[in-house]
């Protein structure tokens, strides 16, 4: 029993000390005041620069409406701004390569969310709750030899 008393006293002393102040890591901000982040989805990789502006979004030197013809893609990309209520407050420039349109959309969404998190740490809880900061790690399963596809096998005949 005396050992437990000593341990609890040590813990109490540590708790009464001043709380540790965690140093925030230096965020990726370039000399022009832009927040930089990378987003990934499937085989697509997006590099995103975010700066305070009027809500202009450029993807591979095209407007977002030109690059993504479907309106639903544009709405999902704007989801981080809707959650954080910052529509038309930031300008975005991003370059995307690899994958298809859906993968590129997911990569841009992930990159924008990460850049918003760096711009204002208050958004972290909101974006985390919306599931926008977690990387979707699902990728295409490889084709196996002796099979038609990744999971599909050749037709089996008993006799």
From Swiss-Prot:
Task: Give the record's keywords alphabetically.
Answer: Ribonucleoprotein, Ribosomal protein
Q: What is this protein called?
A: Small ribosomal subunit protein uS9
The UniProt entry, under HAMAP family, shows: Ribosomal_uS9_B (MF_00532_B)
Task: Name the PANTHER family for this protein.
Answer: RIBOSOMAL PROTEIN S9, SMALL RIBOSOMAL SUBUNIT PROTEIN US9M
- Name of the coding gene: rpsI
Among SUPFAM superfamilies, the record links this protein to: Ribosomal protein S5 domain 2-like
The chain's disulfide connectivity reads none
- Pfam families (alphabetical): Ribosomal_S9
Q: Tell me which Gene3D superfamilies the record gives.
A: 3.30.230.10
- Provide the family line: Belongs to the universal ribosomal protein uS9 family.
One Gene Ontology term from the biological process aspect of the record: translation
Q: Give an example GO cellular component term for this record.
A: cytosolic small ribosomal subunit
């Amino acid at each position: 029993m005396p050992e437990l008393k000593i341990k609890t006293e040590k813990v109490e002393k540590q708790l009464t000390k001043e709380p540790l102040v965690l140093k925030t890591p230096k965020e990726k901000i370039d000399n022009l005041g832009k927040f930089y982040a990378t987003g990934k989805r499937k085989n697509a990789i997006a590099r995103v620069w975010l700066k305070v502006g009027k809500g202009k979004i450029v993807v591979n030197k095209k407007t977002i409406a030109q690059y993504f013809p479907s309106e639903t893609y544009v709405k999902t990309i704007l989801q981080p701004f809707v959650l954080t209520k910052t529509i038309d407050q930031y300008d975005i420039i991003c370059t995307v390569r690899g994958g298809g349109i859906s993968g590129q959309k997911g990569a841009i969404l992930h990159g924008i969310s990460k850049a918003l998190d760096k711009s204002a740490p208050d958004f972290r809880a909101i974006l985390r709750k919306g599931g926008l900061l977690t990387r979707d790690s699902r990728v295409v399963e490889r084709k196996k030899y002796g099979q038609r596809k990744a999971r599909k096998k050749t037709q089996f005949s008993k006799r």
